Amino acid sequence: MTADQKWLAKVATVGLFVGIASVLSSQVAHADDPLAGSDTAIILGGTTEPTPSTAFAQAAENLFLNPLGFDGGATGSTVCDMIGTDPCAAPLQVLTTPELIQQGPSSLTAADDVVLAVQNEFNANPGAFSAEDPLTIFGYSQSATAESIAMSRLEADGIPSQDLHFVFIGDPSLADTGVWPNIVTDLDSVLGSSLTNTLLTDFGIDGVLGNVTPDDLYPTTIYSLDGDGVAQFQQDFESGGLLGDIEGLFVQHVEYLGLTPEEVANATTSTDDLITNVDISDNINNADAWLSAVFEHGAAGSGLIESVLQSLEFYLTNSF
């Protein structure tokens, strides 16, 4: 072997070791992520999004599950629609729930669906889920409330705490700041208790008032965008009154699926028992995020018309 050949061999050997070290380092980093061993996620939509589209489900994975290590850090995974509450064959499994404008009865019905869907996943795949390989359950807005309600029922059914991991965006039931723990007191201070009670009852919200995401039942990661008038209802109310909340409802609360991975990463993280809060900075292009969420990533294409019609049906007939 010539001197040049020996030199090239040494370079190749060093490169090989560097590559192996890089792979091992990457694997160790992933092993620390809460969803590193999870390869199945149940995906639910928010209000007026009863059946998340493929674009919705993949955006949820790319932006909010991928940073937690889901399915080895996968993006663009295949999507299937669950048959009722029965599992289907894809990493991202879409669960259809009502997601009506009347969030009280709608959330309670969706909570029943979540419980059945989780039970059916465990029954169909005995031994598939564990602390190392948890079943992931994703919720946005109203469905985060439904999943929060479902947690106590799942615990009562004997589903082990470490076998599930919930991931929420725009959680209305976020302790201290969310809309459901705070709206009654805040509206009372502006409108008086009589009018507040009438409005909340007429809009079908009374069934979820005071609901809080449990911090002691199942590991939960909650992403909140600064200014979100639902997840950060209390801060918006204190800084801008009801108009601040309304703006945050129709602007930041809509933008989650239109964020970029870099914007999601621009966040501060804190823990509260089993909850990990990821607070995302609003230092973004709001117009781009809003338009991308609505028209590219499924916010307007996940059953909007069906949900509105069902909401009208419920308003007229008290059933859906």
Segments from the language model and where they lie:
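Secretory targeting and sorting signals
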Residues: 1-31, 166
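Surface cap/lid and interfacial helix-loop subdomains adjacent to catalytic sites
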Residues: 33-130, 153-320
